[in-house]
A protein has these predicted regions:
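A nucleotide-sugar donor-handling region in carbohydrate enzymes
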Residues: 28-97, 124, 128-129
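Short alpha-helical segment that forms part of, or immediately flanks, the ligand-binding pocket
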Residues: 152, 169-175, 193
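Short hydrophobic beta-strand element within catalytic cores of glycosyltransferases
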Residues: 161-163, 178-187
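C-terminal alpha-helical cap of glycosyltransferases
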Residues: 239-253
Length: 253
């Protein structure tokens, strides 16, 4: 959707609020929200009018209330930088079965490492049986969870996440959860690059996933301070109160 649609909508409402993450089209709106970490207000200089309020960055990320509520408990847990639980979640239907590829990549980890794996799949996941087969061949305990309703709790209880560099990145940051991110769609690239540049996450190249993932995991075990640093930097990106911030801005229109 772009300006051509918004002009028509404006005839039937007082204010128009737009959520964008691409900055590649013009808008006719009173307020624009872009939650991307590396985005700047100037990216929209030629795309919105001068009177449009621009809310830019993950401090405005729209997270469910359980994430900011669980943030204090989660951050206290990060004082113990040992990896006991790895959380894997690609989101959506994972049509390309990246989850199975991640599990395959873990084969190159030191088999003597002591941790458990929790795999979260969406209700529309297409490759559950494949994931189960790969999971059963690993030397670690693997739990496969489908269509969960307690994602904040699962993140809080985990020590490292492996997942897509989409909107879930802000949930992980809110809880200070260190992450290895994968770019599964072009609009995730900016997020992944921003988090990696900040030191809040590591990006694993999807093309070399099976080759490189194990060495990354091994590195976290040999350098626990790296986890603490990543957690601290991730937690500084968003407090999870974006809903209130955005609501306040809308009420001021």
């Amino acid at each position: 959707l772009d300006k051509s649609w918004e002009v028509l909508i404006r005839q039937r409402c007082n204010f128009v609020v737009v959520i964008d993450d691409l900055a590649d089209r013009s808008h006719d709106c009173d307020l624009l929200l872009d939650q991307n970490y590396s985005r700047e207000k100037a990216d929209y200089d030629l795309l919105v009018n001068d009177t449009c309020s621009r809310l830019i960055g993950p401090k405005f990320a729209l997270l469910r209330e359980e994430f900011p509520l669980m943030r204090p408990i989660s951050l206290r847990r990060r004082a113990d930088a040992r990896i006991k639980t790895i959380l894997i979640s690609m989101g959506g239907g994972d049509k390309d079965n990246v989850t199975s590829r991640v599990l395959q990549g873990l084969r190159s980890c030191d088999p003597n490492l002591d941790f458990e794996i929790k795999v979260v799949l969406g209700a529309l996941a297409l490759n559950i049986e494949s994931v189960k087969r790969v999971a059963s061949s690993l030397p670690w305990s693997v739990s496969i969870l489908v269509n969960v309703t307690n994602m904040a709790e699962l993140m809080m209880e985990s020590d490292l996440a492996i997942g897509a560099a989409g909107g879930t990145s802000w949930e992980r940051c809110c809880l200070g959860l260190p992450a290895i991110t994968l770019v599964l769609a072009e609009n995730q690239r900016l997020i992944s690059e921003g988090l990696s540049g900040k030191g809040a996450a590591f990006t694993c190249d999807l093309n070399n996933l099976e080759l490189n993932l194990g060495s990354l995991i091994n590195r976290f075990f040999t350098d626990p301070d790296l986890l603490k640093t990543m957690s601290r930097k991730a937690a500084g990106i968003t407090k999870g109160d974006g809903v209130n911030r955005v609501a306040d801005e809308i009420m001021c229109l």
